[in-house]
From Swiss-Prot:
There is a cross-link at K56 (Glycyl lysine isopeptide (Lys-Gly) (interchain with G-Cter in SUMO2)). GO terms for cellular component: axon; costamere; cytoplasm; cytoplasmic ribonucleoprotein granule; cytoplasmic stress granule; cytosol; dendrite; dendritic spine. It comes from Rattus norvegicus (Rat). It is found in: Cytoplasm, Cytoplasmic ribonucleoprotein granule; Cytoplasm, Stress granule; Cytoplasm; Cell projection, Dendrite. Homodimer (via CC domains); homodiremization is required for FXR1-network nucleation. Interacts with FMR1. Interacts with FRX2. Interacts with TDRD3. Interacts with HABP4. Interacts with CYFIP2 but not with CYFIP1. Interacts with EIF4G3; promoting translation of target mRNAs. Interacts with ELAVL1. Interacts with CEP63; inhibiting 'Lys-63'-linked ubiquitination. Interacts with PKP3; the interaction facilitates the binding of PKP3 to PKP2 mRNA. Interacts with PKP1; the interaction may facilitate the binding of PKP1 to PKP2, PKP3 and DSP mRNA. One of its GO terms (molecular function) is translation regulator activity. The modification Phosphothreonine is found at T398, T430, T512. One of its GO terms (biological process) is dentate gyrus development. This is RNA-binding protein FXR1.
Length: 568
């Protein structure tokens, strides 16, 4: 504002230093130095320009000069008109022209200057032009330092922003300034906008730098969230980030969207860790045994839904057999969970506990099945003697190598009006390999004894009948020789076992005994013989091998007991 300094004449005739604030048609708005008087408008005829700063100060006795002085202590100093009366070294005796001749004062050379020869200003002494300022630049234009280069380029005396008119005021003592302003004003506003943007970025960078320096000394954590889980981490409308920022002690949370990196700064490690718990979403899987998948899911998904609700995970997915995204163990099915780290830890605890519970229950169930199996073998595998009643039930237990499930007991009744006697049996003993595994050695001996006590005539008759019907067969003698043509049991003895492996093998003894002891007519006996003959026919290679094995077993059993020898 020193460049727009002018002098205003006061009521006492002295000229005081003022600054031009605005230019009007016939006056100037001025501001007094040190604001010793309020701002006011002064007409042109009371205003003059100050003398040039490089004026030569050659003062001698008798010259009119201007003295920088004041009339009283309440007023500032101004330039008063005076006359030099005497000089002595650097001191001058002056006489004020506006006062009585008797009022003199001794002053130094620095307070004197030659009389200002400038006239009062006129309408064309100062020129003013205006530039409209956009709304986004008004705050920036209020700073006069922003127009320093523009002021120098156009040759203006002063450039300032007028808030009432929202315009830039350019004041100058040269008319050429107005033309330059018209040329450079648009460029000046663009430069202000660019500078403003750069300054704003620099300020933000400075603040960020200061904040980073402060946070670097505090607690902070950095972690990465997968791109497909970033939406869960941010939350709806940034709800998770807002919730994390509300944690007491958290000072800042930064997110690098390009890399999915979160940076959390806080005053304590606990605050930072708590905020991290709201933002860190991960995906993890747990291996579940295949045989327990259904029980882990539960009916209508009730069990797995309860686990999800209690743990707090967002979602759960069961990987299919045709998916190979995750490492898979034999006999295991991966359950994939998505949620915060805390919720993933919760679901691991719940699921591992539930799986352990299911395994323990399964183990107890298997133990119970084994106990039940042993009870069946002990209680149902016992063979009573041949004198049991016709309505008595007979049970057996099967080996795991032959039948996969346990069959129930079956009851069979005899035929005819009576039995031939307890000593009559069929021509075949029960094969030990097909009998109940719980059968004891004593039971087998009893069976062989019954077989050996059968009538020799009856056995011989059957042997001859079978020999005539199958002359080419290898007959089996009573003494225990091996062959396919020997005496056999009834029709249902072997063929029934081959047709129905799950049937009760002890029923053969009962049926054979009943058939041979029944008091029947000749036709009924002939029909029974035909049935026994048909049962001995080989249907397949496997059937022949089975019967051969039974023959060898029966022969060996008879020879061992010494009951197979025949006395001719």
């Amino acid at each position: 504002m020193a460049e727009l300094t002018v002098e205003v004449r006061g009521s006492n005739g002295a000229f005081y230093k003022v600054f031009i604030k605005d230019v009007h048609e016939d006056s100037l708005t001025v501001v007094f130095e040190n604001n010793w008087q309020p701002e006011r408008q002064v007409p042109f005829n009371e205003v003059r320009l100050p003398p040039p700063p490089d004026i030569k100060k050659e003062i001698s006795e008798g010259d009119e000069v201007e003295v920088y002085s004041r009339a009283n202590d309440q007023e500032p100093c101004g330039w008063w008109l005076a006359k030099v009366r005497m000089m002595k070294g650097e001191f001058y005796v002056i006489e004020y022209a506006a006062c009585d001749a008797t009022y003199n004062e001794i002053v130094t050379f620095e307070r004197l200057r030659p009389v200002n020869q400038n006239k009062t200003v006129k309408k064309n002494t100062f020129f003013k032009c205006t530039v409209d300022v956009p709304e986004d630049l008004r705050e920036a234009c209020a700073n006069e330092n922003a127009h320093k280069d523009f002021k120098k380029a156009v040759g203006a005396c002063r450039i300032f922003y007028h808030p009432e008119t929202t315009q830039l005021m350019i004041l100058s003592a040269s008319e050429a300034t107005v033309k330059r302003v018209n040329i450079l004003s648009d460029m000046h506003l663009r430069s202000i906008r660019t500078k403003l943007m750069l300054m704003s970025r620099n300020e933000e960078a400075t603040k960020h730098l200061e904040c980073t320096k402060q946070l670097a000394a505090a607690f902070h954590e950095e972690f990465v969230v997968r791109e497909d889980l970033m939406g869960l981490a941010i939350g709806t409308h940034g709800s998770n980030i807002q919730q994390a920022r509300k944690v007491p002690g958290v000072t800042a949370i930064e997110l690098d969207e390009d890399t999915g990196t979160f940076r959390i700064y806080g005053e304590s490690a606990e605050a930072v860790k708590k905020a991290r718990g709201f933002l860190e979403f991960v995906e993890d899987f747990i291996q579940v045994p295949r045989n327990l998948v259904g029980k882990v899911i539960g009916k209508n998904g009730k069990v797995i839904q309860e686990i999800v609700d209690k743990s707090g995970v967002v979602r759960v997915r069961i990987e299919g057999d045709n998916e190979n995204k995750l490492p898979r163990e034999d006999g295991m099915v991966p359950f994939v969970f998505v949620g915060t780290k805390e919720s993933i830890g919760n679901v691991q605890v719940l699921l591992e506990y539930h799986i352990a519970y299911l395994k323990e229950v399964e183990q107890l169930r298997m133990e119970r099945l084994q106990i039940d199996e042993q009870l069946r073998q002990i209680g149902m595998g016992f063979r009573p003697s041949s004198t049991r009643g016709p309505e008595k039930e007979k049970g057996y237990a099967t080996d795991e190598s032959t039948v996969s499930s346990v069959q129930g007991s079956r009851s069979y009744s005899g035929r005819g009006r009576g039995r031939r006697g307890p000593n009559y049996t069929s021509g075949y003993g029960t094969n030990s390999e097909l009998s109940n595994p719980s059968e004891t050695e004593s039971e087998r001996k009893d069976e062989l004894s019954d077989w050996s006590l059968a009538g020799e005539d009856d056995r011989e008759t059957r042997h001859q009948r079978d020999s005539r019907r199958r002359p080419g067969g290898r007959g089996r003698s009573v003494s225990g020789g091996r062959g396919r043509g020997g005496p056999r049991g009834g029709k249902s003895s072997i063929s029934s076992v081959l047709k129905d492996p799950d049937s009760n093998p002890y029923s053969l003894l009962d049926n054979t005994e009943s058939d041979q002891t029944a008091d029947t007519d000749a036709s009924e006996s002939h029909h029974s013989t035909n049935r026994r003959r048909r049962s001995r026919r080989r249907r397949t290679d496997e059937d022949a091998v089975l019967m051969d094995g039974m023959t060898e077993s029966d022969t060996a059993s008879v020879n061992e007991n010494g009951l197979g020898k025949r006395c001719d």
